[in-house]
Swiss-Prot record:
<keyword id="KW-0963">Cytoplasm</keyword>
<comment type="subunit">
    <text>Homodimer.</text>
</comment>
<comment type="similarity">
    <text>Belongs to the DTD family.</text>
</comment>
<feature type="short sequence motif" description="Gly-cisPro motif, important for rejection of L-amino acids">
    <location>
        <begin position="137"/>
        <end position="138"/>
    </location>
</feature>
<keyword id="KW-0820">tRNA-binding</keyword>
<dbReference type="GO" id="GO:0106026">
    <property type="term" value="F:Gly-tRNA(Ala) deacylase activity"/>
</dbReference>
<dbReference type="Pfam" id="PF02580">
    <property type="entry name" value="Tyr_Deacylase"/>
</dbReference>
<keyword id="KW-0378">Hydrolase</keyword>
<dbReference type="GO" id="GO:0043908">
    <property type="term" value="F:Ser(Gly)-tRNA(Ala) hydrolase activity"/>
</dbReference>
<dbReference type="InterPro" id="IPR023509">
    <property type="entry name" value="DTD-like_sf"/>
</dbReference>
<dbReference type="InterPro" id="IPR003732">
    <property type="entry name" value="Daa-tRNA_deacyls_DTD"/>
</dbReference>
<dbReference type="GO" id="GO:0000049">
    <property type="term" value="F:tRNA binding"/>
</dbReference>
<keyword id="KW-0694">RNA-binding</keyword>
<dbReference type="GO" id="GO:0051500">
    <property type="term" value="F:D-tyrosyl-tRNA(Tyr) deacylase activity"/>
</dbReference>
<dbReference type="GO" id="GO:0019478">
    <property type="term" value="P:D-amino acid catabolic process"/>
</dbReference>
<comment type="function">
    <text>An aminoacyl-tRNA editing enzyme that deacylates mischarged D-aminoacyl-tRNAs. Also deacylates mischarged glycyl-tRNA(Ala), protecting cells against glycine mischarging by AlaRS. Acts via tRNA-based rather than protein-based catalysis; rejects L-amino acids rather than detecting D-amino acids in the active site. By recycling D-aminoacyl-tRNA to D-amino acids and free tRNA molecules, this enzyme counteracts the toxicity associated with the formation of D-aminoacyl-tRNA entities in vivo and helps enforce protein L-homochirality.</text>
</comment>
<dbReference type="GO" id="GO:0006399">
    <property type="term" value="P:tRNA metabolic process"/>
</dbReference>
């Protein structure tokens, strides 16, 4: 799994002009899934996401997590995070998971995050979405589970 996590003042996602999800202070999580991913990666990445200390404490140090600040999360599926443009100028997406597996793990990610009582909104898997956000910082963190030793 590969994710781009952005600390936001607000974020919202819409499809065909209809708002599907909207949050204020929290994290916008762009989530890419590859064919090698499983529930192990989901659990590890949810744990990392909810505990990532990228919110400022009273001394303006990034020392607080999403849970600490009672922030919200907006989760957006994004297969293009597995785009490879090393050869040519048109990205290849062969490293992205097939839709059935990707959707299943995407929904499990959302379910797992909600199990920690984190208010979670989501986009529509596979849809052409419009995402609007106001970065806070900006703070943007990229995490790839292949770089972790997940057992």
């Amino acid at each position: 799994m590969r994710t781009v996590i952005q600390r936001v003042k607000y974020a919202k996602v819409s499809v065909d002009g209809k708002i599907l999800g909207e949050i204020n202070k929290g994290l916008l999580v762009l989530l890419g899934i590859t064919h090698e991913d499983s529930i192990k990666e989901v659990k590890w990445l949810v744990n990392k996401t909810k505990n990532l200390r990228i919110f400022e404490d009273e001394e303006e140090k990034m020392n607080l997590s999403l849970e600490d600040v009672k922030g919200k999360a907006l989760i957006i599926s994004q297969f293009t995070l597995y785009g490879n443009s090393i050869k040519g100028n048109r990205p290849s997406f062969i490293d992205a998971a097939k839709p059935d597996l990707a959707k299943d793990l995407y929904l499990k990610f959302i379910e797992e995050l909600k199990s920690f009582d984190i208010e979670t909104q989501e986009g529509e898997f596979g849809a052409d979405m419009k995402v609007e956000l106001l970065n806070d910082g900006p703070v943007t963190i990229i995490i790839d589970t292949k770089d972790a030793n997940i057992k």
